[in-house]
């Protein structure tokens, strides 16, 4: 199974970037959720504008699909400057980075997605550019080679990564602002869905937006993708209007259940319950049981299930929690009766 094939993947799909651009907020005032990040960035941007300076270099990290690219574009919009976008894997040689840096105007934003994937040789060129706004370039080859320094206009580097731990310390230390994006709550996601539906000219009821939001795995990108698929269903079977019932029918047809699990998630949990008595079970045995690759379980399926408290990693292997049994309407073994929950998105009935 390929992660990109799943409807509920947080990774971007082909052509999705262009679709998302149409509904992406351009101002902090329209940026929904992440209240701490929003308030801090508003303060930093106002201060930089008041001093007529470029914003400090900014690192944005967190799981995929939470709005790192959106926030980078908002920073440029709020600062009233242009943004140039690239990604770590694209910058293969120092010359690739130099070409971008020398074309920046004063105050511009250079956005580097997947910045943890920069090669060491490109990083070395980036350090003086970030710190001193200077570019060291080697002219010539062999004994005749010499280094010259080019002055760069002040600019803001905005780096985005899903793996902050993979950044080298020298690179991380050069960011004056570091922001972590967290998974969204259901209410904020419902607001995002309602806003996106309005931009798309799609009538939607509050309960319809909520139904989509609670199955979106805390991720705006997934929420907007589900909205587009529910729109297709509503236009054919619901007269173009999204109600809770229409959203529920559409998402059930798409095999996304009320917890945001798809067939692969449920198959993994059921295999652990039915074939291994809830665990512990080794990942290789589990992979053989469901005919998947080991890395698919570790990198694609496990993270969300662990984060939501439906399974755990232990020294003896993987085990399911009582929430997995309850999800399938099964009796919970007594040994699991007091297990703690890791559910991030649970909604209290009180």
UniProtKB/Swiss-Prot annotation:
Enzyme class label: hydrolase
Region ranges (Disordered): 1-20
Binding of ATP, residues: 23-24, 65, 68-70, 131-133, 174, 184, 221
Catalytic activity: ATP + H2O = ADP + phosphate + H(+)
A GO cellular component annotation in the UniProt record: cytoplasm
Superkingdom field: Bacteria
Keyword DNA repair: yes
Region described as Small ATPAse domain (RuvB-S): spans on this chain: 185-255
One Gene Ontology term from the biological process aspect of the record: DNA repair
Keywords: ATP-binding, Cytoplasm, DNA damage, DNA recombination, DNA repair, DNA-binding, Hydrolase, Nucleotide-binding
Domains: entry comment: Has 3 domains, the large (RuvB-L) and small ATPase (RuvB-S) domains and the C-terminal head (RuvB-H) domain. The head domain binds DNA, while the ATPase domains jointly bind ATP, ADP or are empty depending on the state of the subunit in the translocation cycle. During a single DNA translocation step the structure of each domain remains the same, but their relative positions change.
Subunit composition and interactions: Homohexamer. Forms an RuvA(8)-RuvB(12)-Holliday junction (HJ) complex. HJ DNA is sandwiched between 2 RuvA tetramers; dsDNA enters through RuvA and exits via RuvB. An RuvB hexamer assembles on each DNA strand where it exits the tetramer. Each RuvB hexamer is contacted by two RuvA subunits (via domain III) on 2 adjacent RuvB subunits; this complex drives branch migration. In the full resolvosome a probable DNA-RuvA(4)-RuvB(12)-RuvC(2) complex forms which resolves the HJ.
Known role: The RuvA-RuvB-RuvC complex processes Holliday junction (HJ) DNA during genetic recombination and DNA repair, while the RuvA-RuvB complex plays an important role in the rescue of blocked DNA replication forks via replication fork reversal (RFR). RuvA specifically binds to HJ cruciform DNA, conferring on it an open structure. The RuvB hexamer acts as an ATP-dependent pump, pulling dsDNA into and through the RuvAB complex. RuvB forms 2 homohexamers on either side of HJ DNA bound by 1 or 2 RuvA tetramers; 4 subunits per hexamer contact DNA at a time.
Family: Belongs to the RuvB family.
Designated name of the protein: Holliday junction branch migration complex subunit RuvB
Gene field: ruvB
């Amino acid at each position: 199974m390929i992660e990109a094939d799943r409807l509920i993947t947080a990774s971007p799909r082909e052509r999705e970037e262009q679709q998302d651009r149409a509904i992406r907020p351009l101002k902090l005032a329209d940026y929904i959720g992440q209240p701490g990040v929003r308030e801090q960035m508003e303060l930093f941007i106002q201060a930089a504008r008041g001093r007529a300076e470029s914003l400090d270099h900014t690192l944005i990290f967190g799981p995929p699909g939470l709005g790192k690219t959106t926030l980078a574009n908002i920073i440029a919009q709020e600062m009233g400057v242009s943004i140039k976008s690239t990604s770590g894997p694209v910058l293969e040689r120092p010359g690739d980075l130099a070409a971008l840096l020398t074309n920046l105007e004063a105050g511009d934003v250079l956005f580097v997605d997947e910045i943890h994937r920069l090669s060491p040789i490109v990083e070395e060129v980036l350090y003086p550019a970030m710190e001193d706004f200077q570019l060291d370039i080697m002219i010539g080859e062999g004994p005749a080679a010499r280094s010259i320094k080019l002055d760069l206009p002040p600019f803001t580097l905005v780096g985005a990564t899903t793996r902050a731990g993979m950044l080298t310390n020298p690179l991380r230390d050069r960011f004056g602002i570091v922001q972590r994006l967290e998974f969204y709550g259901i209410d904020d996601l419902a607001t995002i869905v309602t806003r996106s539906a309005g931009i798309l000219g799609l009538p939607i009821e509050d309960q319809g937006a909520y139904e989509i939001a609670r199955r979106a795995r805390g991720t705006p990108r997934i929420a907007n993708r589900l909205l587009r698929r529910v729109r297709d269903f509503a236009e054919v079977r619901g007269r173009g209007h999204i109600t809770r019932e229409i959203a529920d029918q559409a998402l059930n047809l798409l095999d996304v259940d009320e917890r945001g699990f798809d067939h692969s998630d449920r198959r993994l949990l059921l295999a652990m319950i039915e074939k291994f008595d809830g665990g512990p079970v080794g990942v290789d045995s589990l992979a053989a049981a469901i005919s998947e690759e080991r890395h698919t379980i570790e990198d694609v399926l496990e993270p969300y299930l662990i984060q939501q408290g439906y399974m755990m990693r232990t020294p003896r292997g993987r085990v399911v929690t009582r929430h997995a049994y309850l999800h399938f309407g099964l009796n919970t073994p007594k040994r699991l009766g007091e297990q703690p929950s890791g559910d991030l998105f649970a909604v209290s009935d009180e």
